[in-house]
């Protein structure tokens, strides 16, 4: 594992040139190859609710967006997505949704336990936002294996510029530490290029990842949504995202690191580039086709048509072209 002080990280992300960029890319990919071989883990993403109580300023699903199309999948629909995914070879299902009050602990625990009962060889990852310690514990006891909760920014002032007053960075971080304590494989992460972000803030994000020591980290470029206050902002810089992926791989060699949908949205080859810079996870969409375009976190999101998870052969070909292969095992986090 590599380590770097804040001043070294700041210098790296503010002054890197093409030579530094390529050197870090090669080191990161070599590190991933040493630990995982050329394996890329696939996770089946099920976006089960576009209803959210929160009003995050950057998100297309924010409560106050009256143009958003709202839906929620039934338990049977979620299980059907899992069945389709299992037949396609997926062994991890990622259940992601807005903070929708319909999905109480009783409802979610019933869904999780049924997935584990029907598909005992599969891992269940949840991404349901901020919940109580007791809620996280119940979901874990029902069979959930992993939990994704991006912190978005580790700078308190910056967090307040991206979220309404009722949300706090302290609570977000406490949730992450609670998840770790309970025993989840825990995922944090942040946007790159979000409004008001500075290089110093990105360094804070990297140091927080070092401190939290999550099993997973999801980063991607900020992508504006037309129905938010940041609609006229530019999207995050792809090169900087790739640079940060490489740095995270070197700081945390064993981490599960996705090449995110947002990266593929901003750059047609974004996911391949992410893999070449140290990522080792991709998350195709298993959601019902009729709802994919409605889970609109940001504009122009890819994977909204028939091609998403069904085109598993296409994804395999794309990975093969860069010397990697997709694998269908659970892909759990392990220490060296």
Residue ranges and their predicted role:
Residues 46-48, 99-101, 128-132, 153-155, ...:
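Active-site-proximal loop/turn and secondary-structure-junction residues that shape catalytic pockets
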Residues 43-46, 66, 94-105, 157, ...:
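Glycine-rich, proline-tolerant flexible connector loops at the mouths of alpha/beta enzymes
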